[in-house]
Design a protein with these regions (language model features):
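Helix-adjacent hinge/juxtasegments
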Residues: 50-99
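Glycine-rich phosphate-binding loop signature in dinucleotide/nucleotide-binding domains
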Residues: 23-27, 93, 113-114
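Active-site metal-binding loops of divalent metal-dependent hydrolases
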Residues: 7-10, 35-37, 58-61, 103-105, ...
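Residue-level marker for the onset of beta-strands and adjacent loop->beta junctions
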Residues: 42, 86-87, 126, 151
Length: 168
């Protein structure tokens, strides 16, 4: 299964549309969002994805109540709060144990525990990936293009491989 991973929309709906089209072209079946919708209208658009979406809040998600309300009508949209993937909110996609947080300073220690197969984070607006034992730590970069080239990522659960992709 292919998972599309994105972060830091910062209300850039044009780039979000590009990201969603790219995910469709690449055959993504589920999405992981690592925080910073910023406004409810960005969350609303992401909630229109045709498959499951796993999402967390970021530091720039000001009106969390409004964001929660606009995604509440989509039973396939799972908004975990600050992080997802612990024992109470286990995220397993195609047998891969996943943790999602906005913050890399939490994600890297979580990746080092060995409890997860993949840990995804955002916040820095810089795409990166590294391995800690058998666990992948991946930051897809930013959709918004605020600090550089907009990027997203794909994760293939069958191959346990990932790819960073630039948006045009």
């Amino acid at each position: 299964m292919i998972i599309g991973i994105l972060s830091d929309i910062h209300d850039n709906l044009n780039k979000l549309e590009q990201a969603l089209r790219l995910f469709e072209e690449k055959g993504a079946q589920e999405l992981v969002f690592c925080g910073d919708f910023c406004s409810p209208f960005s969350a609303r658009r992401l909630a229109q994805w045709n498959g499951p979406v796993h999402a967390v809040f970021g530091n720039n998600d000001g009106d969390r109540f409004a964001i929660s309300r606009v995604v509440a009508d989509n039973p396939k949209f799972r908004l975990y709060g600050e992080y997802g993937g612990d024992e109470q909110q286990l995220i397993s996609i195609d047998g891969i144990r996943i943790c999602i947080t906005h913050y890399p300073f939490y994600a890297v220690p979580l990746a080092r525990t060995g409890w997860f197969d993949a840990v995804f984070a955002g916040h820095t607006h810089k795409a990166e990936k590294q391995r800690f034992g058998s666990c992948l730590f991946l930051n897809p970069g930013e959709v918004a293009g605020v600090f550089g080239t907009p990027t997203v990522a794909l994760y293939d659960t069958a191959l346990r491989s990932s790819e960073l992709l630039e948006l045009g």
